[in-house]
Amino acid sequence: MAAAALPAWLSLQSRARTLRAFSTAVYSATPVPTPSLPERTPGNERPPRRKALPPRTEKMAVDQDWPSVYPVAAPFKPSAVPLPVRMGYPVKKGVPMAKEGNLELLKIPNFLHLTPVAIKKHCEALKDFCTEWPAALDSDEKCEKHFPIEIDSTDYVSSGPSVRNPRARVVVLRVKLSSLNLDDHAKKKLIKLVGERYCKTTDVLTIKTDRCPLRRQNYDYAVYLLTVLYHESWNTEEWEKSKTEADMEEYIWENSSSERNILETLLQMKAAEKNMEINKEELLGTKEIEEYKKSVVSLKNEEENENSISQYKESVKRLLNVT
């Protein structure tokens, strides 16, 4: 049985060799696709670079609308200004630098947006919103009377690419207290509230606002402060009703102890002279009383000096007929 199986195994092995040889031949005969590589171009045949466009100034017409080119304040643009502008001081003697890439032209402010044509267009556009100046306001006194509040603000021009300045937001409001409807109590209280913002010499109250980032906001805030101060000055607190003469901000002659004492003294002197026809109103209107009043008020409200003391001394002598 083993002898019969041996020839069968040999025949199977020879067939396997024939099949393996056939498959190898078929595989070698079939072409294998290889990945294609991009073809290299020589160095002198590179694709051309993109050409830079010509500046805008070469395409501008002579009769173009210039306010459309520079409508607002902006830094200098060399590609938009058709002028051979040069600026700078070269180290070696020569021609100043051209406008292309010139930093000196960017530093300084320009007024290319404020040409005569642009100003004329602005005026024509604003005519519909403007009215004629009132004919009755023909003097500064009348303007101050009808418009007592004065608003000051400043626009800055600085050397730099930015047209903004943080100090331009500051607003200063000025008004004379005499133009406001205030009585004696309200005026003194308002002066006490504002402190150093009030100038006694010129009678002007100055309010400066710079807390807000915009000028309009600072203007509204200044008007708001003035409104609050005005209404608060008219309020009378309970403790204000109990103020005595020593608590007053300034000495007032009317109904003061000095007025009462001098009236009593003069009435006693007149009674001793048996002259009962003179009353208090006539005594207060005499020249001696007026001089004594001025000297006392000056001595109380102002600093004491030799001049005020001598005036007080002379007024007392004349009042009491003392030589």
UniProtKB/Swiss-Prot annotation:
The keyword S-adenosyl-L-methionine does not apply. One of its GO terms (biological process) is mitochondrial translation. Residues 257-321 form a coiled coil. InterPro entries: Ribosomal_mS35_mit, Ribosomal_mS35_mt. Component of the mitochondrial small ribosomal subunit (mt-SSU). Mature mammalian 55S mitochondrial ribosomes consist of a small (28S) and a large (39S) subunit. The 28S small subunit contains a 12S ribosomal RNA (12S mt-rRNA) and 30 different proteins. The 39S large subunit contains a 16S rRNA (16S mt-rRNA), a copy of mitochondrial valine transfer RNA (mt-tRNA(Val)), which plays an integral structural role, and 52 different proteins. Residues 31-59 are annotated as: Disordered. This is Small ribosomal subunit protein mS35. Keywords: Coiled coil, Mitochondrion, Ribonucleoprotein, Ribosomal protein, Transit peptide. GO terms for molecular function: RNA binding; structural constituent of ribosome. Belongs to the mitochondrion-specific ribosomal protein mS35 family. It is found in: Mitochondrion. GO terms for cellular component: cytosol; mitochondrial inner membrane; mitochondrial small ribosomal subunit; mitochondrion. Its main location: mitochondrion. It comes from the Eukaryota. Pfam families: MRP-S28.
